[in-house]
């Protein structure tokens, strides 16, 4: 089994557990160049809030879009957008990525900005 298949298997298992809880989830995805975050409704069919380093306003503020500072900025922004929509409690879905580096930085900054998970 290759690296990507293993990550997808881990993500599927975690998403199944989150679906049983019927919780709103904060989904994180990372690529070598960008970091993405979405708050998804419990039914899985609606994106409530989204933020990523692809957004022009974010890219202009940051020197690099693929480091921990960029992930922290995205975490703060996604928390602000979710709280604006009335979402304060979420389940953290790391999409099979290790809770380390950019994923951990995004999670910590979202917690500091007011999201609870």
UniProtKB/Swiss-Prot annotation:
A GO BP entry: translation
Entry annotated with the keyword Ribonucleoprotein: yes
Keyword list, A-Z: Ribonucleoprotein, Ribosomal protein, RNA-binding, rRNA-binding
Example of a GO MF term: 5S rRNA binding
GO annotation, cellular component aspect: cytosolic large ribosomal subunit
Stated family: Belongs to the universal ribosomal protein uL18 family.
Subunit structure: Part of the 50S ribosomal subunit; part of the 5S rRNA/L5/L18/L25 subcomplex. Contacts the 5S and 23S rRNAs.
Role according to the record: This is one of the proteins that bind and probably mediate the attachment of the 5S RNA into the large ribosomal subunit, where it forms part of the central protuberance.
Name this polypeptide is given: Large ribosomal subunit protein uL18
